[in-house]
Amino acid sequence: MNKHASLIHPTAVIAPSATLAPDVQIGAFTLIGNDVQIDTGTIIGSHCTIHGPTRIGRNNRFIGQAAIGGEPQDKKFAGERTELLIGDNNTIREFVTINRGTGGGGGVTSIGNDNWILAYTHIAHDCHVGHHCVFSNNASLAGHVTVGDWVIFSGFSGAHQFCRIGRYAFIGMGTLINGDVPPFTLIGSDTLGRPRGINSEGLKRRNFTPERITAIKRAYRTLYVAGLPLAEAKQQVAEQAKDNDDIKELLQFIETAQRPLLR
């Protein structure tokens, strides 16, 4: 038995066209389908299913029972070739489901690097997740959701299709998102998904200076506390953004919203 074979459990099933780096480990009763590529250092636990076309990067850990790269749960899907792309250093826990894209949605679902995707999380077709995100147990994304870097979804939270979640946002437990969430925003733990302030603690942990946090708070108050119509609030935020990259990011997010801003 060669060294690579010894890293693959004898009960695992590896399709002929799957491509595995020599040090990839595959657990018991796992199925690796056709057109799956898995890069070096990745560990696939027991009872996982990974369907292609799927590309998985380096040093990922699939703990067990995950269903990855399955067909999208979209009635418009007609069997067209679509794919799932997963980056490096992600941890994907038990019973996570991540679906491939659809032809009508760009054809790709993508997961970045260094994400922590916990048990029973569902990430639907055509979603795009950035880097360093956390999805707590039972978090769910409907189709076409875009999630920026450093976002945290608490347990049992979810996002409606086509929503965007800006960088450094925090989504509270049990919250249902039905609009775009601006960067840096904290969404309260209720089913209405109402903004409750900025994610101050998360920003501190990411080494934002007090001055940066104060500027973000000021922009938040302009948008959410001052009682201004959105058009007028955007004008004031634009003034604040002239010499501040964080506020420029916030303003650009607002101006490119495809769904109503969660407000």
From Swiss-Prot:
Cellular component terms (Gene Ontology): cytoplasm; membrane
Main location as per UniProt: cytoplasm
Reactions this protein catalyses: a (3R)-hydroxyacyl-[ACP] + UDP-N-acetyl-alpha-D-glucosamine = a UDP-3-O-[(3R)-3-hydroxyacyl]-N-acetyl-alpha-D-glucosamine + holo-[ACP]
Enzyme class, broadest EC rank: transferase
One example GO MF annotation: acyl-[acyl-carrier-protein]-UDP-N-acetylglucosamine O-acyltransferase activity
Catalytic activity, EC: 2.3.1.129
CDD domains: LbH_UDP-GlcNAc_AT
GO biological process: lipid A biosynthetic process
Pathway: Glycolipid biosynthesis; lipid IV(A) biosynthesis; lipid IV(A) from (3R)-3-hydroxytetradecanoyl-[acyl-carrier-protein] and UDP-N-acetyl-alpha-D-glucosamine: step 1/6
Localization per record: Cytoplasm
Keywords: Acyltransferase, Cytoplasm, Lipid A biosynthesis, Lipid biosynthesis, Lipid metabolism, Repeat, Transferase
UniProt keyword annotation of Cell inner membrane present: no
The family this protein is said to belong to: Belongs to the transferase hexapeptide repeat family. LpxA subfamily.
Subunit structure: Homotrimer.
Role of this protein: Involved in the biosynthesis of lipid A, a phosphorylated glycolipid that anchors the lipopolysaccharide to the outer membrane of the cell.
Name recorded for this polypeptide: Acyl-[acyl-carrier-protein]--UDP-N-acetylglucosamine O-acyltransferase
The species this protein was found in: Xylella fastidiosa (strain 9a5c)
